[in-house]
From Swiss-Prot:
Gene: pyrH
Protein name per the record: Uridylate kinase
Statement: the UniProt record of this protein carries the keyword Cytoplasm: yes
Keywords recorded for this protein, A-Z: ATP-binding, Cytoplasm, Kinase, Nucleotide-binding, Pyrimidine biosynthesis, Transferase
Its biological purpose: Catalyzes the reversible phosphorylation of UMP to UDP.
Amino acid sequence: MKYKYSTVLLKLSGEALKSENEIYNKEKLEDIAKQIVELAKNGLKLGIVIGGGNIWRGKLGTDIDMPQINADYMGMLATVMNGLALESTIKRLGYDKVNVYSSLPIETVTDDYNFKRARLKMNEGYISIFVGGTGFSYFTTDTNSVIRAIEIGADAVLMAKNGVKGVYDSDPNLNPNAKFYKKLTHREIAENQLRVMDLTAATLAKDAKLPIEVFDMQGQNNIIKVMEGSLESTIIEE
């Protein structure tokens, strides 16, 4: 199978794993895992970063007067749980070549992160799931996605959105006349304050000349379709 990239970093939101009333939805987990397995079996080298928003959000910490540092680490731990959920689903589907690398040492259930080891294992067909954020507070999973993408030599970051096909000049759910962008530069993201990712992540991607493709994952096989180049999306590159 011919894909538009050979190595990618897939950024998933935690919300992509949940249902209305449950933090995990079996069907959604299996759908994502099946697509990931198909891509890996067809030779794609794949790294994955998952958010933790289905379990923990910073606002919850604010509501109980928790210091941001503590709240950030709780968010990082939520990504560990999501990574383990995705790993177990992938393995249940019969694909055992998957590693979970954590920036926070949790030796019983994850591997300590080392980019050289991750690259070697990815060359052997292993899927790498990166959890625990950067390991430091005040940094988002967007920033972690860009850092890991650079470290594994990814051709691009695939940023999966829920129900939005790419980047608009305003919220399309609130503004029916919102303008959709097919192509943007990293500089335009910052200058126009477009809500794609945080400024730190956008700046890192710009400096590394790392393309970012934003797409809607809510559709049958949309992760595969974006890799095949058959899905409408927004591409951010210099």
